[in-house]
């Protein structure tokens, strides 16, 4: 199974910008850690980062043609105003987890509202780079449960066909 991780604006600057908020870990290191954990659990993982809303919308939509089973997304600042990203997530109808490294509820008022939190499977905030790891654990669990449900349904259908 395949998971796509989408990083929004300014996340390419991790380890450089606002280290007091986001810590010293670079995006490449977060991706390497996630890749290792995904492989240990038998999952394929791919990463995408853009500072542009339309490109992120394209990346979400392209998930359907790439046989992606689930999306982990940190929309960053776009969380708070991108109806386009919200609509793209709804359109692809894939299990999606929203990630934020900082606790957005403890930050500026404008960061308190997420336009996607009500349409995703869950939201993980405030654990720094570990937020991504927690999101990956959650996504693996969700996808394994979906797989088991499909297998059980297929088994039940096969038994029903025998009768």
From Swiss-Prot:
Signal peptide per UniProt: none
Record GO terms (molecular function): 3-dehydroquinate dehydratase activity
Entry-linked Pfam families: DHquinase_II
Catalytic residues (positions): 22 (proton acceptor), 100 (proton donor)
Membrane spanning stretches: none
Keyword Amino-acid biosynthesis belongs to the record: yes
Annotated site (Transition state stabilizer): 17
Function: Catalyzes a trans-dehydration via an enolate intermediate.
Matches recorded under NCBIfam families: aroQ (TIGR01088), PRK05395.1-2 (NF003805), PRK05395.1-3 (NF003806), PRK05395.1-4 (NF003807)
SUBUNIT field: Homododecamer.
Name of protein: 3-dehydroquinate dehydratase
Species assigned in the record: Nautilia profundicola (strain ATCC BAA-1463 / DSM 18972 / AmH)
Gene encoding the protein: aroQ
